[in-house]
Amino acid sequence: MKVVIGIDPGTAACGYGIVHESDGRLRALGHGWWKTAAGQRPELRLKTIFEGVAALIEEHAPAAVVLEESYVGADARIALSVGQARGAVLVASAVAGVVCAEYAPARIKQTVCGYGRADKSQVQRMVKTILAMPQEPTPSHAADALAVAICHLLGSPLLRATA
């Protein structure tokens, strides 16, 4: 039996998903997101994420906290913001003594959908199917967080050890 918390980092919207594995079966224990106001001071936005992750860790005692690796696109401001959110998650995990792993978006999509360039709707459908959920998880940030947790749990043990 193992619990993994997946995180889709971002400062405006940070998704989370908690997945439980027992005897090879996966089920969602919960999912959601933290939304912060655009006008809020950056340190307060990061505090919201840090406290949210810390509360999830305390409640679920996960074996790991897993994140989607940062994608550095054309907008440096967004990349910096996502990096700050990732930092809040990593520190919350380190304070609690929980191992962290990171996965590339293409690897997550390949594991969950069988196709590394799957779109958001395909990821949501497959997360619903894999976790036997009654409906597709929303918002997409939460679905992405569940997907990274699934990736960690379904990936090979050797790959998890090097993630």
Regions found by a protein language model. Name each.
Residues 1-163:
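Phosphate- and other anionic-substrate recognition elements at nucleic-acid/protein interfaces
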